[in-house]
Regions:
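Conserved N-proximal alpha/beta basic substrate-recognition cap immediately N-terminal to
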Residues: 42-140, 149
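ATP-dependent carboxylate/phosphate-activation module, predominantly the ATP-grasp catalytic core
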Residues: 190-262, 293-325
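Peripheral (often C-terminal) accessory segments that flank ATP-dependent C-N-forming ligase machineries
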Residues: 276, 282, 312-342
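Hydrophobic/small residue at the entry helix of a nucleotide-binding pocket
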Residues: 19
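Conserved metal-phosphate-binding beta-hairpin within the catalytic cores
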Residues: 232, 261-301
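A short, Lys/Arg-enriched amphipathic alpha-helix followed by its capping loop at the start of a domain
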Residues: 23-32
Length: 342
């Protein structure tokens, strides 16, 4: 790992959760000094793995908002991940003064599931049906809640009656009713570089969810006797290598998402950096796209030393976290930081 002297004094900073280990390790691989803002009591992994040159302990992540001047004075660059938006909220993230890797104008399109759907439609991607009211339910559906909370609270229903019975336990949260597509779930990890204009397919994963990934070990009769209800709480991620014949369509979908993003709110910059498409591949090998995450996703943590696909391209360990740091380093070398920071 290179000495921490890269980048004309700039440091890479993030908050201690989600993919912070990967982000900071990747930054150190590219020679950056690193800063971690961590809630008290959660610092042990970061101390053990020694990824943070500076560890700032806080009672709550939201205290970052009060230390922006310190981060500015240290020339810190914030790398967002899923916990950012739960910790601060969309409006506070949009108002951050510390340089931020990514396009903040895209965030509202990711955060609102209906706006996100509009974006994906503009990209010409195939989407599952959305039901406006429970009374429209005419087959299996999955009810999803807004926000990056790891699938918490999602549930299945087959009728309006079943929907109303299950939603009682989850009242007060905004949701969408989405057609349930039978197939293989695949999360595609992309990186788009505004410096080169090139899209990279970094890796793939599938989620390991409780209890849906263990319920199959229980016979159907016993499931009925026990009255088990399927849940989708994410506990981890599993690596995937896709059929090579699927790669052209995977590249096409990513490029379409980036191209469509440049037309959102008249912003010609659009989406850049890491992002992910949540897909299901049906038995006839058709992709349905459920969601887009306009940031690094936790599934990339599988590949801290790179994936089979980054091995082909880089011939050296290249995680998504390291790829972010390399993009920043290149922008500094080209005197073009304004292109990638908000």
């Amino acid at each position: 790992m290179g000495a921490a002297n890269t980048g004309n004094g700039h440091k890479i900073a993030t908050i201690g959760s989600h993919s912070a280990l990967q982000i900071l390790y990747g930054a150190k691989q590219e020679g950056f000094s690193t800063v971690l803002i961590c809630e008290k009591g959660r610092e042990q992994p970061y101390e053990s793995y020694k990824v943070a040159d500076e560890l700032i302990l806080v009672d709550k992540f939201s205290e970052l908002l009060k230390m922006q001047q310190k981060l500015l004075s240290e020339k810190a660059i914030l790398i967002p991940h899923g916990t950012f938006f739960d910790a601060f909220g969309l409006e506070e993230v949009e108002k951050l003064k510390v340089p931020y890797f990514g396009n903040k104008k895209i965030l509202k399109w990711e955060a609102d599931r209906m706006l996100q759907r509009e974006w994906l439609k503009k990209a010409g991607l195939t989407l599952p049906k959305i039901y406006k009211t429970p009374e429209e339910i005419d087959g299996p559906v999955i009810i999803k809640f807004y926000g990056a909370r790891g699938g918490k609270g999602f549930f299945l229903a087959r009728s309006a009656e079943e929907f109303y019975k299950k939603i009682k336990e989850r009242e007060g949260r905004s949701y969408i009713i989405q057609e349930y597509i039978i197939g293989a779930p695949i999360y595609i990890h992309y990186f788009y570089s505004p410096l080169t204009g090139e899209l990279e397919v970094m890796s793939f994963d599938r989620r390991y969810e409780s209890n849906v990934d263990s319920i199959g070990r229980i016979a159907a009769k016993d499931q009925l006797d026990l009255g088990l209800e399927t849940s989708y709480n994410i506990t981890g991620n599993l690596p995937v290598v896709v059929r090579e014949s699927l790669l052209p369509e995977i590249f096409r979908m990513g490029e379409a998402a980036v191209k469509a993003s440049r037309k959102l709110d008249g912003d010609k910059i659009g989406l850049y950096g890491p992002f992910s498409l949540e897909t299901v591949i049906t038995p006839d090998l058709k992709f349905f796209v459920f969601e887009i995450s306009a940031r690094i996703v936790a599934g990339t943590n599988l590949y801290i030393n790179g994936s089979p696909y980054t091995d082909l391209r880089y011939k050296e360990p290249m995680s998504t976290g390291r790829r972010i740091a390399r993009e920043i380093k290149r922008a500094i070398e080209q005197n073009n930081l304004s292109l990638i920071l908000n």
